């Protein structure tokens, strides 16, 4: 189907959370309505409570409300907080960066510490070149992803705010 609409290489993932070795329905993610609400994946929180406390028009932001979500495996909660921590770490510790945006994309069925994409956008101070900072930024992103469980620990211990 994709070849009808693009000449680009397309990779399709279907039912990646299913367990093909299962001998009964417990290994498959099946719903009657087609929504996650029947499987306990729903959040009981509105969309106004941003992880960083801000509603930022004309800037990248997530509509995900982090409060009330599972701090162990809800990527909307974890990646929102993780993105903020990465951005703070980079801006505080890498000379020459004024601002930073971090975007992390999950993939169903993959471990949380292995996102489909982790993308950064930096706004540099005058005279600073991307090649002066890119390796340092990449190292900080990698370090946070390797130790992503600290996000859960900090939320559970009340050290990290979710709004």
Predicted segment positions?
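A domain-level signal for the structural core that forms small-molecule/cofactor-binding pockets
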Residues: 1-163
């Amino acid at each position: 189907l994709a070849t009808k609409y693009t000449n680009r290489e397309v990779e399709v993932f279907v039912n990646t959370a299913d367990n093909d070795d299962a001998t009964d329905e417990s290994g498959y993610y099946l719903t009657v309505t087609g929504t996650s609400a029947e499987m306990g994946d729903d959040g009981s929180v509105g969309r106004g409570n941003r992880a960083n406390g801000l509603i930022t028009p004309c800037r990248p932001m997530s509509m995900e409300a982090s409060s009330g979500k599972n701090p162990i495996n809800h990527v909307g909660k974890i990646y929102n907080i993780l993105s903020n921590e990465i951005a703070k770490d980079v801006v505080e510790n890498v000379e020459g960066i004024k601002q930073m945006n971090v975007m992390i994309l999950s993939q169903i069925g993959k471990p949380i510490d292995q996102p489909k994409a982790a993308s950064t956008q930096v706004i540099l101070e005058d005279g600073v070149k991307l090649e002066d900072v890119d390796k340092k930024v990449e190292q900080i992103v990698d370090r946070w992803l390797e130790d992503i469980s600290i996000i859960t620990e900090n939320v559970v211990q009340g050290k990290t705010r979710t709004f």
